Regions:
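Conserved N-terminal entry element of GNAT/NAT acetyltransferase domains
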Residues: 1-9
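Structural motif
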Residues: 11-13, 34
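C-terminal structural segments of small proteins and small subunits
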Residues: 68-103
Length: 104
């Protein structure tokens, strides 16, 4: 798989960020828009693409979009929460009251 085959987008109609490989959805992260934030609820990689690092790539894109839009991230999805723990450069996207959970 080449980077040229990968497309990342915010599919706002379906309330999810998508990563497509060759035009087909390979991974997605669902969210709900809440006041000033995106609440991430579920991230999934299709079985044919597991182990390729696509979920991490997708979440980095999603969190960059959250930052670009001036929003906060609410990581209810365990994968998104774990990603933020491993990448503290995104910790500022979590509202201050919720950051304690990431500082353990």
């Amino acid at each position: 798989m080449h980077d040229a085959d990968i497309q990342l987008c915010d599919n706002a109609d379906r309330h999810r960020f998508e990563l497509r490989v060759g035009g087909e959805v390979a991974a997605f992260s669902e969210y709900n828009a809440v006041k000033g934030a995106l609440l991430f609820t579920h991230t999934e990689v299709l079985p044919a693409h597991e182990g390729e690092g696509l979920a991490s790539r997708l979440i980095a894109f999603a969190l960059d979009e959250v930052r670009r839009q001036g929003l906060h991230a609410i990581p209810a999805c365990p994968f998104v929460a774990a990603y933020i723990r491993k990448h503290p450069e995104y910790l500022d996207l979590v509202r201050e009251a919720g950051r304690r959970a990431f500082l353990k």
